[in-house]
């Protein structure tokens, strides 16, 4: 996968393993909201790719936003969306490092045997993607009938 797809997979996997949140609507995947049922819409927004240092072949720093829109049924008041927002803010807390290993990375082998590290973990040809959370915040809720929506913005960065 490309670095952007690894970042997306890292954040999406972290979101999917969050306990207590409603169904997740992903980018470019068919999703039909059901009136009366809450959901979270997730969008990855890459914002920049810049050299981390000067010189030949510098490491690149990627920055972006992970935009989450919590949609709860209209008429429940703002608290329903804020309850989910609190779970997401805790899950994507500032200074959190999220580690993602692409399941399609090849295992490094020698003579048909996996090369193991001292702790008996396998050595991958690639390295895991580490996405760091810069900040997470809640924005003002708004009505989008039949849903009341609460935006959560998560700023992230990674080096590659």
Language-model regions, residue ranges each:
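Charged, amphipathic alpha-helical segments and their flanking helix caps
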Residues: 1-23, 45-160
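Short acidic low-complexity segments
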Residues: 25-36
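A short, glycine/Asx- and small/polar-enriched loop/turn
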Residues: 34-40, 145-148
């Amino acid at each position: 996968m490309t670095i952007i797809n690894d970042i997306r997979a890292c954040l999406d996997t972290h979101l999917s393993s969050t306990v207590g949140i409603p169904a997740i609507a992903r980018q470019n995947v068919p999703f039909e909201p059901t009136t009366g049922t809450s959901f979270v819409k997730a969008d990855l927004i890459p914002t920049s790719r810049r050299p981390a240092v000067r010189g030949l072949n510098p490491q690149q720093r990627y920055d972006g936003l992970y935009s989450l829109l919590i949609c709860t049924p209209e008429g429940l008041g703002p608290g329903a969306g804020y309850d989910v927002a609190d779970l997401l803010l805790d899950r994507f807390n500032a200074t959190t490092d999220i580690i993602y290993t692409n399941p399609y990375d090849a295992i490094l082998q020698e003579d048909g045997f996996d090369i193991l590290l001292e702790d008996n973990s396998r050595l991958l040809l690639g390295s895991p993607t580490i996405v760091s959370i810069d900040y997470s915040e809640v924005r003002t809720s708004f009505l989008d009938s039949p849903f009341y929506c609460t935006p959560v913005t998560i700023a992230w960065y990674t080096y590659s």
